[in-house]
């Protein structure tokens, strides 16, 4: 277990088992229990690794949003694994996934979270064009510095230029 307290891990395991039990009853078959990991960084709350039958959760966002993770994020990621096991490769938030979210877990098929991400958000850098300013992530900023990418304003079509200002 990485960066997570035992009690929180226990609650996550309980939620995971409850989801698989619901799916087993609903589909009248036995699904393998997914592996739970806390090795996810950035702004994503969770991610399902389909071939590995693994769910990775963002430990920082989990600590800050315990109830939502247990009631929404874990079922969301389990639904991805179930969709893959039942239907193979289909659209990530397509009709099959939505039917599992709504039919099995009785949850809305939301595709994104609304968590505050200030604690996990990386550094941003200010870029500008003729008409406005843009915050670029550190990943995009580094690509510009290494001459691997350039970014263009969709409005004025000018290449964005670094202002020299780090925003966060």
From Swiss-Prot:
Residues 18-161 form the SprT-like domain. The active site is at 77. Its main location: cytoplasm. Binds 1 zinc ion. Its cofactor is Zn(2+). Zn(2+) binds at residues 76, 80. This is Protein SprT. It comes from Vibrio vulnificus (strain CMCP6). The gene is sprT.
């Amino acid at each position: 277990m990485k960066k997570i307290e035992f009690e929180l891990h226990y609650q996550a395991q309980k939620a995971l088992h409850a989801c698989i039990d619901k799916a087993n009853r609903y589909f009248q078959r036995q699904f393998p229990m997914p592996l739970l990991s806390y090795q996810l960084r950035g702004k994503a709350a969770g991610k399902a690794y389909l071939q590995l039958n693994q769910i990775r959760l963002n430990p920082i966002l989990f600590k800050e949003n315990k109830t939502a993770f247990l009631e929404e994020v874990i079922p969301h990621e389990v639904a991805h694994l179930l969709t893959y096991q039942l239907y193979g490769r289909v659209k990530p938030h397509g009709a099959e996934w939505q039917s599992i979210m709504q039919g099995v877990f009785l949850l809305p098929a939301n595709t994104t979270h609304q968590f505050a991400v200030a604690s996990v958000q990386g550094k941003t850098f200010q870029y500008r064009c003729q008409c406005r300013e843009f915050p670029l992530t550190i990943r995009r900023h580094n690509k510009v510095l290494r001459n691997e990418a350039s970014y263009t304003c969709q409005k004025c079509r000018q290449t964005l230029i670094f202002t020299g200002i780090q925003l966060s």
